Regions:
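Structural motif
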Residues: 108-109, 158, 190-191, 220, ...
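Acidic, Ala/Val/Gly-enriched low-complexity intrinsically disordered segments
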Residues: 6-13, 19-21
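N-terminal ligand-binding/catalytic initiation module
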Residues: 16-234
């Protein structure tokens, strides 16, 4: 799947758009005329949102049979409606560092679709975050949530804030400033954010504390991913990583095999990657590589999950710290984790990872 990332280097969106025209990026001739016009109008409306274009194009490609079976969807402009968010919120997030210097970041919440229930989707804190990426993720969240059978709509949010290298106090102040604006737009029956890249249990706790302070109400349902001591759910931390492996196990079973004895590579080393690694190894696989934004580690003896948790969750270190404490592991800052030979690849870091 092609995407906006080449290795670890983020490409400037305007330059990428100028490099080639739309016909070279997305072959609209493969879409039926009705969907082709929907996509072309979307691109004309938001010409530089390439990540969002990609998500919409891929969904529209799968809807071709539906167009012929349900012509009334065209009459009701269903495809136009589903590709336009119900609401897009962008806001300023000022915060002070430990030296008293003021910084300003940009916050986002795209409430894409609430046809099935309250908006639901994570918050991402990462310097690459922009409106296109949030719309990309929010659009896909509509369909992911609908497949659960639960009454949930689709949304996504976040900020172009980099939590790496920040103290706990700095992250707390940022989260408090972020929630001071976000709280106007969310609620248990309106929009229920969760965590994502850069937003774990610590950040959710800071966000929930500020929401509770401003609203003077203990609305436990306003955020998911909270700690068990203030209304969180058992196994919430493990759920995404475990779920990935359970799905992959079913895919392997359909091909007459299983994780047992497989050599596995897992990108990332955050919440999803750690628990995907744990579950894959419980099912008999050997996970030989994990990564973070600084590089990747290869451990032919199999990733030591407890050491990985200690490095990344408790000490919030770099993946190189794992290699420094594990004689069987080697760290590389060059190349790609996808160059490591494996039977199964589990992308757990960000969107559009696979080359």
């Amino acid at each position: 799947m092609g995407g906006p990332y080449v290795g670890k280097e983020r490409v400037n969106e305007n330059q990428r758009w100028n490099d080639r025209d739309m016909s070279e990026k997305f072959d609209t001739s493969r879409l039926p005329r009705e969907l082709s016009s929907v996509f072309e109008e979307l691109v004309a409306r938001d010409p530089y949102q390439l990540e969002f274009h990609q998500a919409v194009y891929e969904v529209l490609m799968t809807l071709t049979p539906l167009v012929t079976r349900k012509p009334e969807y065209q009459d009701l402009a269903i495809f136009e409606r589903i590709t336009e968010p119900e609401r897009q919120v962008m806001f300023r997030v000022p915060w002070s560092d430990d030296q008293g210097q003021i910084h300003v970041n940009r916050g986002f919440r795209v409430q894409f679709n609430s046809a099935l229930g309250p908006y639901k989707g994570g918050l991402r804190f990462h310097p690459s975050v922009n409106l296109s990426i949030i719309k990309f993720l929010g659009f896909e969240q509509i369909f992911k949530n609908s497949l659960t059978g639960l009454p949930m709509g689709g949304a996504k949010g976040g900020a172009n804030f980099n939590p790496k290298g920040k103290s706990d106090a700095e992250i707390m102040r940022f989260c408090q400033s972020f929630m001071t604006e976000l709280q106007r737009h969310i609620g248990p029956d309106t929009d229920v954010p969760a965590g994502d890249i850069g937003v774990g249990g610590r950040e959710i706790g800071y966000l929930f504390g500020q929401y509770r302070r401003l609203r003077n109400s203990f609305d436990a349902g306003v955020l998911t991913g909270k700690g068990l001591t203030w209304g969180g759910s058992f196994a919430r931390t493990e759920a995404t990583g475990y779920g990935l492996v359970y799905f992959a196990e079913e895919m392997l079973r359909a091909h007459g095999t299983s994780f047992d004895g497989k050599r596995v590579v897992v990108s990332g080393s955050g919440n999803v990657a750690i628990y995907a690694t744990e579950k894959a190894q419980e099912l008999g696989a050997t996970v030989v590589a994990v990564s973070d934004s600084s590089g990747f580690v290869v451990d032919e003896a199999g990733i030591d999950v407890e050491l990985l948790k200690d490095v990344k969750e408790r000490r919030r270190g770099r993946i190189s710290d794992y290699a420094n404490q594990r004689s069987s592991a080697r760290f590389s800052a060059e190349g790609s984790i996808w160059e490591v030979p494996c039977d199964v690849a589990l992308p757990c870091a960000t969107q559009n990872e696979l080359p």
